[in-house]
A protein has these predicted regions:
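Short, acidic, Ser/Thr-enriched surface-loop or helix-capping motifs
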Residues: 68-74, 126, 174
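Active-site glycine-centered loops adjacent to acidic/histidine catalytic or metal-binding residues
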Residues: 9, 33, 56, 121, ...
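Short coil-to-beta-strand transition motifs
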Residues: 54-61, 117
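AMP-binding/adenylate-forming catalytic core of the ANL superfamily
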Residues: 94, 99-100, 107, 122-179
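Conserved ATP/PPi-binding loop(s) of AMP-dependent carboxylate-activating enzymes
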Residues: 58-61, 72-110, 148
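Active-site phosphate/pyrophosphate- and oxyanion-stabilizing loops and adjacent acidic/basic residues
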Residues: 18, 53, 106, 155
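Short, P/G- and charge-enriched loop/turn segments at secondary-structure junctions
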Residues: 48-54, 75-77
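Gly/Ser/Thr-rich phosphate-binding loop
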Residues: 1-51, 63
Length: 179
């Protein structure tokens, strides 16, 4: 008898959570982790009602912040307002956390800022602490000076009942940058 369904990896669209509830009789609990973190750090635990489309909340003992990383100066600033897009950062120090990329010192230095590991995932955190995946920092296209996360556009497209799957890529444009 199936009692619990969890997912980790690519973020689930909210529609998948509703599908699980409708077809399987159980919601799908989406979770977040990276190989670099060594385990699930953010989760939709069974103790709380699921917010479909959310990655969940940090597990007890896991400190996360949303940061703004200035590409030009390298400065990292913690965003302390809810619902503002930024990069997910986790406080380092748990035993399973990787120490760096083998043979790639520059990449290793780039993802650690002080006591924080910058994940490369763009998120927003609501006032209740739930995290919402926006896209990858390296998966953003620039259109007429605006940064657009392709995952956000894909999510909007697949929320329509006539769309099963979607993929968004940037196409070079003379005046808009990408379109």
């Amino acid at each position: 008898h199936l009692r619990f369904i969890a997912s980790v990896g690519e973020p689930l669209n909210a529609e998948a959570v509703w599908w699980g509830k409708r077809v399987l009789g159980l919601p799908i609990h989406d979770n977040w982790w990276q190989t670099e973190t060594g385990g699930i750090m953010v989760a939709n635990t069974p103790a709380f009602a699921i917010k479909p489309g959310s990655m969940g909340r940090p597990l007890p003992g896991v400190d996360v912040v949303v940061v703004d990383h200035d590409q030009e100066t390298g400065e990292v600033t913690v965003i302390d307002k809810p619902d503002v897009e930024g990069e997910l950062a986790l406080r380092v120090g748990w035993p399973s956390m990787f120490r760096g990329y083998l043979g790639d010192e520059a990449r290793s230095r780039a993802c650690f800022t002080g006591e924080w590991y910058r994940s490369g995932d763009l998120v927003r955190q609501d006032a209740e602490g739930w995290l919402w995946f926006v896209g990858r920092a390296d998966d953003v296209i620039k259109v007429a000076g605006n940064r657009i996360g392709t995952a956000e556009v894909e999510s909007a497209l697949v929320s329509h009942e006539a769309v099963a799957e979607a993929a968004v890529i940037g196409k070079p444009h003379r005046t808009a940058g990408e379109a």
